[in-house]
Amino acid sequence: MTAPDAPWPVFREKTGQLPDGTEYVIRVPEKWNGLLIRDLDFASGLVNPERVDRFCDMAARGYAIAGTARHRLRQWQYDPAREITNHDRLLDLFEATYNTPKRVLQYGCSGGGHLALAISENFPERVDGVVALAAHVPVWLMNTFLDGWFVLKVLLTEYYVGAGLGRAGDLVIAELPNDGSAHPTGHGMEGKIPDAWCKAFTAAHSDGLGRARIALAFALGQWGAWVADDTPQPALDDAEALQEAMYRSALRLAQSPGGEARIMFENAAQGQQLSWNTDVDYGAFLENANPALRHAVETLYNKADGDLAGDLERLAKTPRIAASSHALDFWAAPGRNTIGQPKIPVMRLHMVGDYQIPYTLMLGYIDAVRANGCGELVRTALVRSTGHCNFATAESAVAIETMLARLETGDWPDTSPEALNARATALDAGDSARFMEIDGYEAPHFNRTWVPG
């Protein structure tokens, strides 16, 4: 038994490496209640101040936790299907070392959230339910990012070049280089490409039409307008406040040109392109945009005496980006995509200001599960925050408790923001939950749901 510094309870621990070199950690509290939570990021999360409190809380409630660290070669060899296999190996180890759990939950954030969703659809046999936080779905994500970045490249290049800041070719959005400029985790870049984009955004922001065009990119990409930390959440009926928020958000997004972790996603299929816009009608996308963003775009174009229809025509005439059939075959395999057909209950959370994964992916998932007749298996909740995966311990705890209530009774408890916030407070997890209504953040439908075949 190990007795660490508070707030961890006394626990037993097993650590090691799986056959592919992935590190793992298993912790079983002395007063284990039979529930096992698996998490892609448990091993690495133990040293992450934004995550460790959640794990402490789980153990304090009697839950065993088993999970991994992300593989050191993940930036070049990302494969969620292999990560799922690793989690089954981890469950084998757990059962051989301790005992068969009464219940197993798959829990995770970002890539771990994708793992949870994929398990619920394609590999549910050994898991009772999933809690997915800030989940990405690679092709969905790269396509929705491509839309906004394509608009930015087409409409903002003139400001960058016109100001003498560089050449049009500096503003790269796809087929990004493996030249060491990407962070080893696959998230974010340094060097000339993000620097060029920051300069382009600043140059465009100095012009009224440039500001309107930045807003158009956010609307067509279905990106959240408020993703920059330490900035106020803008009023949705204030076009100027929304535009300022989008500009600050664009500067943050510039650290991942073409979309968060694009290099990692492209590398997964031998560098082949997984996103495309060859069949996209951006005029139709504007009609389908979030109403507040669409109104802001129209207001800003009118204020700048800009030609919105002309810019849409310009987008229509610009050569598009095609996907590789090899890449799409890779991403179509079980475990690498989700289509909204869970076989077990799913509780999904997303932050409205997530800069890595727009909250609109969750809206697309909601539409998909309803269309597939799976709506009763799924509940979702939106959190008022910027960042990525920095969920409060209370938010994590109430999501798990909500899932357990569903498994124990067969019915979902109330998952309205008010009910979730109240139950989170009652759990006394040490911080406060920030669940919010979606009012004003809706879109008629998500543009980039991908169902292979």
Model feature map: region roles:
Residues M1-G453:
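C-terminal His-loop and adjacent cap/lid subdomain of alpha/beta-hydrolase
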